[in-house]
């Protein structure tokens, strides 16, 4: 009888341990899937050279992802030192400029916005063609 009780207790420990491991893995998976999801996806297009949508409104703490779905290089920046026209880019007071660098076809860039205000950005490659956009971040 004691052997049967020990066997049952051992099986119970194994099952409980397995369920705890599954629960931890599930919590990690849920946390990653929530963190990885952008609030908005902006598509970078070739013809005409443009962002879609051109203007978007999000909440502070949200993430925006720019995806190069075209066949050309694209670039997303709010950095005045990268822009041809300084008026094409801006960040609100207290926010740092961001710059994706060159994005090849199929690549993407994400930015999480914590400072409320208006962010004006451009594609440094196609700025002369008017490829500009705006993210409005609300509190």
Label each PLM-derived region with a short phrase.
Residues 2-19, 23-139:
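Extracytoplasmic copper-binding redox domains, predominantly the cupredoxin/blue-copper superfamily
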């Amino acid at each position: 009888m004691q052997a049967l009780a020990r066997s049952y207790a051992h099986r119970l420990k194994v099952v409980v341990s397995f369920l705890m491991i599954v629960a931890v893995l599930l919590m990690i998976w849920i946390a990653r899937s929530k963190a990885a999801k952008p609030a908005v996806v902006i598509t970078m297009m070739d013809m005409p050279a443009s962002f879609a949508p051109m203007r978007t409104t999000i909440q502070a703490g949200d993430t925006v992802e720019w995806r190069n779905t075209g066949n050309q290089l694209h670039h997303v920046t709010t950095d005045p030192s990268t822009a041809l026209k300084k008026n094409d880019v801006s960040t609100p007071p207290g926010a740092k400029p961001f710059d994706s660098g060159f994005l090849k076809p199929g690549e993407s860039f994400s930015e999480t916005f914590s400072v409320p205000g208006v962010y004006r950005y451009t594609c440094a490659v196609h700025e002369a063609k008017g490829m500009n956009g705006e993210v409005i971040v609300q509190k």
